[in-house]
Amino acid sequence: MTLKTAGEAALGVSEFRGLDRRGLITGLTAALGAGMGVAPAAARDLAQEPESATETEPIRLLTNLFTRVGAAVYIDNRGPFTFVIDTGAGATSIADTLADQLALPPLPPVLVHGITEARITRSVAVNRLQLSGLAFRNLNCPVFERDQLGADGLIGLDVLGRFKLSFDVVRRAASLTIRGVAIVMGGDMQTGSRIRREGLRASTGRFGQMMLTQVTVEGQPVVAFIDSGAQYSIGNLALRRAISARRSDGGRLSRAVPIYGVTGQSLSADLTRVDELRLGANRLGATPLLFADLHAFDTLGLSDRPALLIGADLLGRFREVTLDFPNDTVTFSGLRRQPTRAMDIPGN
């Protein structure tokens, strides 16, 4: 069965100009940190300071799934190129075809933590990456095959970690805000919404991920992190064992499905339905989840404790999701009704 989400159905295939619909079931792409040897973006440079804190600059937007958004960026004053915003990527990454096209200076190989294992990949130097009115200098970017990225590159947490990142799921829009200046990407991000907002405090993970502890699955407390590039949410096997132990029947039936990562590895995951999932005060009710021991959990030190990767399927349950990196806060706003259709995954 062709993999297709509600977001794709609403937009139509033609709207996905250039983003690979074969997609990555998980966006633990380009590094849940490009491991050792990848330095974070150096000093931030405002290319064109907006005249007021309320001024916004539009960015050409491409969308895939609910939160996989692509912005037009310039690399060393050339472009525009489409880079996908990915909160699961520790480092900003670039496609091999673009790195070769721009003849970017090579850097030493770096260790990249993929979905099932760590791998060594080449990296290049980007002197200046411009995103609308903001420019970031001295980026060390891992390089991946373009077919695996499905875009010209990924904007990772080394850049995103300076912003408040907001996803307007209903309007299929996103915005980045820094020092009161908002950069709008697609749709019409509106202020003054009456949607109730309740922020959850977060801690910072090894590679900049926002780690949440106010999350429970069937009453079991878990450590969770958000990966906006991941199509589906995935729990680790420690979580699976914990919730199975809490059930008198020992657990529900599940079936195996393959999942794939940007570094090319694949592994088998179990699909099952949990009775209750809570994000702070938000009760999501019965929810389908995948379970697998991703390398990402081990990388973040979460292999032996119940943990959950929150992907686009859960983010899409809300009207708005905001990751305020400077203030270590995540806000889920406007919980929507649970869709009645089953999760569409390869093999159905």
Feature roles, as predicted:
Residues 2-348:
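Pepsin/retropepsin-fold aspartyl endopeptidases
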